[in-house]
Amino acid sequence: MRILLSNDDGYFAPGIANLAKVLLEIADVTVVAPERDRSGASNSLTLDRPLSLHKSHNGFYYVNGTPTDCVHLAVTGMLDELPDMVISGINDGANMGDDTVYSGTVAAATEGFLLGLPSIAVSLVSMSRGNFPTAARIVVDLVKRFTENRFHIPILLNVNVPDVPYDELQGVEVTRLGRRHKAESVIKYQTPRGETVYWVGAAGAAQDAGEGTDFFALQNNRVSITPLQIDLTRYDQIGYVKNWLTL
């Protein structure tokens, strides 16, 4: 089993280090990750400059680009053999509901999927307890299951794991994405030099968080696994828009 491992927190992040360590016990693992934190980079590709690839002292490769760049570069230009699977994470923080649109973690897995590879994004719904071994163990379980019973269709999974010890988990649930309220307003302040600057506001609170959603699973200390797709079409609105255009 050959695994390409990436993330959006950077090659130095504890999540990817924890995951690489346990995956190396069951697979050949190549780590290609951003040289710095690229959280929120979504599916962006770097097109305005060339990318460079370097190898760290710990054997991880890092790229001066986005999570999507990392996977694209590795699969299409770096690796001599294609990986059997792409895994992105472990992200330090949730990627539930609307988060998936912005997430570099999900984006790295999405790029693997677009390149024809089974892909998994995994996030620790962090409360600063640092239970990365819990999330890593969940990923190992999924990889072993994949090895024993490979998917017969292309698959892209978004996994969120409660920030608790493994023995406190209340199970695993296949879920749909919930929704958040709109994001908080930007935070505006002045620097000591009088310049007005802004920080992006916090994500909105959970809105659609009922039973069956990723939010609900995490609230009940269950691992959430959500199958994702690329097609963003609102099929139920095609007829409505056609009628609107003919008015």
Swiss-Prot record:
Annotated positions binding a divalent metal cation: D8, D9, S39, N91
Note on cofactor: Binds 1 divalent metal cation per subunit.
Subcellular location(s) of the protein: Cytoplasm
Pfam families the record matches: SurE
Cofactors that this protein relies on: a divalent metal cation
This protein's record includes keyword Nucleotide-binding: yes
The EC number(s) this enzyme carries: 3.1.3.5
PANTHER family linked: 5'-NUCLEOTIDASE SURE (PTHR30457), 5'_3'-NUCLEOTIDASE SURE (PTHR30457:SF12)
Similarity section: Belongs to the SurE nucleotidase family.
Stored NCBIfam families: PRK00346.1-3 (NF001489), PRK00346.1-4 (NF001490), surE (TIGR00087)
Protein name: 5'-nucleotidase SurE
Organism, scientific name: Nitrosomonas europaea (strain ATCC 19718 / CIP 103999 / KCTC 2705 / NBRC 14298)
